[in-house]
Amino acid sequence: MVLLFVFREVIMKKIVYVDMDGVLVDFNSGIDSLTLQEQLEYEGRFDKVPDIFSKMEPMIGAIDAFNRLSEKYDVYILSTAPWGNASAWSDKYEWVEGNLGSAATKRLILSHNKHLNIGDYLIDDRTANGAGEFQGEHIHFGKGEFPDWESVLTYLEA
C-alpha cells in the first residue's frame, strides 16, 4: 500500500479537474452575443438559450493556463450541462475542440455529480453540482485568493 502511494506521488501526475462556465469559458460573452429580444426572453435562464455555449469566448488567460497545467498535471475538463438544453452538451464538446484541440475532447467529462470524480484539485467557480463535496482541494476560481488564472497558476506551479 505504501509503495502504491509512493508510486502515485513520484511517477503519476496529480489530477486536476477544470470547470468550464466561469472558469475556462466566459459565460457573459455568450449573453452579450444575444439579441436584445433573446436577452429579454431568456432573462434569468440564459443556460436554456439554444446554442448559447457555442457563442462563448475563453476567459482571459484560460487557454494558456490549461496548456501550462497540462504539462505538469493530468488535466480533465469537468463541467455540467443543463438538462433542459440539449444543444448545450454538443456545444460544450465543440467549444473544447475549437479552443483546446481534439485531444482535449477526450478529457471532457460532463456530470451533475462532480464529487464522484477522484482527483487532487478541482478548479471551479461554484460549489454546486458536487463541487463543494469534492474530496480533493477545491480551488474556488474567481473568489478570494484565486480571482483569476494568474493566481491559480502561481499556486499550482509553485
Residue positions per predicted region:
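Short, Lys/Arg-enriched N-terminal segments with co-localized hydrophobic residues
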Residues: 1-11
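Active-site neighborhood of HAD-like aspartate-dependent phosphohydrolases
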Residues: 12-54
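Conserved Lys-Pro-Asp/Glu-containing loop-to-beta segment of HAD-superfamily phosphomonoesterases
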Residues: 15, 105-133
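Short catalytic/ligand-binding loop motif for oxyanion handling, primarily in non-cytosolic enzymes
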Residues: 25-28, 77, 84-88, 116-118, ...
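Substrate-recognition element of Asp-dependent hydrolases with the DxDx(T/V) motif
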Residues: 57, 62-90, 96
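Active-site donor-binding segments of glycosyltransferases and PAPS-dependent sulfotransferases
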Residues: 86-114
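Acidic, Mg2+-coordinating phosphoryl-transfer loop and its flanking beta/alpha structural elements
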Residues: 121-153
